[in-house]
Design a protein with these regions (language model features):
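A detector for short, charged/polar N-terminal pre-domain segments
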Residues: 1-3
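Short basic helix-loop element that most often maps to the first helix and adjoining turn
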Residues: 6-21, 76-77
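Short alpha-helical DNA-recognition segment
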Residues: 16-34
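DNA major-groove recognition helix of helix-turn-helix/homeodomain DNA-binding modules
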Residues: 27, 46-63
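Helix-turn-helix/homeodomain-like alpha-helical modules used for DNA recognition
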Residues: 60-79
């Protein structure tokens, strides 16, 4: 499932993460995040995987493009 810039911004918002926080969690530069979210360039497949993994580890589940479009939701945390 390709990560969309809008999903990236939405996932960061749900996690209350800055671009810098995501960059640190994924091991990429903040400018990579900024340029991707502003539609300046696409991500390399390996970078996309790192971002998705960082979101999943933090509890943000990326939803594929379905009837209502792609999305993001937070996973339930165990009590």
């Amino acid at each position: 499932m390709p990560l969309l810039p809008e999903q990236c911004r939405a996932a960061r918002g749900l996690l209350n993460w800055t671009q810098q926080r995501l960059a640190a969690a994924a091991g990429v530069s903040r400018s990579t995040i900024k340029d991707f979210e502003c539609h300046r360039h696409a991500l390399h497949e390996s970078t996309e995987h790192l971002l998705i993994e960082a979101f999943e580890q933090a509890g943000a589940h990326l939803l594929p493009d379905g009837r209502d479009g792609p999305g993001v939701r937070l996973k339930r945390l165990p009590r």
